[in-house]
Amino acid sequence: MFDLTGKNVCYVADCGGIALETCKVLMTKNIAKLAILHSVENPQAIAQLQSLKPSTQIFFWTYDVTMARADMQKYFDEVMVQMDYIDVLIYGATLCDETDIDGTINTNLTGMMNTCATVLPHMDKKKDGSGGLILNVTSVIGLDPSPVFCAYSASKFGVIGFTRSLADPLYYTQNGVAVMAVCCGPTKVFVDRELTAFLPYGQSFADRLRTAPCQSTAVCGQNIVRAIERGENGQIWIADKGGLELVKLQSYWHMADVFLHYMQDKEDD
């Protein structure tokens, strides 16, 4: 169980849709500080959030998830002046544009990895932080493939692979930072807009998705926070159809068994 009371939360996402609803729930958890990082500011949404809990400090910084790692490091050095420390990092920036493969990969995957790598030293209990939690908000088509949104699905599969890798005890026992992911099912904010399939053969299916049943952003946001509070390091959750379900992870190639000797410390030999 993870208690959000008094925690400093950094949320990388737009201040609308699922992110806004998640932040609304976070504001009911007596968090100390909330930082929202995105390329476009939404003053109305931030004012709405502040009205929910005036005692919680809210910050907004303009943030480009595609910036170079060196620039990110300078950026977060400035963020930390106001935040002091980060207990929870939530990465929810996402792009589904099958006509822009580079943008989709850079936003959903590369930007997430660079952000995590940049923020981790500020959370690492052996460095500048006291441990904490990283939550990657991803998609159910990062678990099962999508013949319609191939690039988007590939980027989300990458998020799952990175999350599970970073959650390995090799890191967690040292830095004290748990890493999890929540895979959101079809949500209203996603299907309400025009969608383009990777290949023309899938376009009729993409068009029909706009009328498919989907969960509300409010319910999805509630379940994202539930996953934070209930989850443990390495877990992957599905937030779909108004519910929250833990994914039963399976290993097909047991790396530790095959390379155990090479993965041991020299002192263990």
From Swiss-Prot:
Keyword terms, alphabetized: Oxidoreductase
Binding of substrate, residues: S139
PROSITE patterns cross-referenced by the UniProt entry: ADH_SHORT
Gene Ontology terms, MF aspect: oxidoreductase activity
Disulphide bonds in the chain: none
Keyword Oxidoreductase found: yes
Organism for this UniProt entry: Drosophila lebanonensis
Cellular compartments per GO CC: cytoplasm
Name the UniProt record assigns to this protein: Alcohol dehydrogenase-related 31 kDa protein
Family under the similarity heading: Belongs to the short-chain dehydrogenases/reductases (SDR) family.
Record-listed NAD(+) binding positions: 11-34
Active site, renumbered: Y152
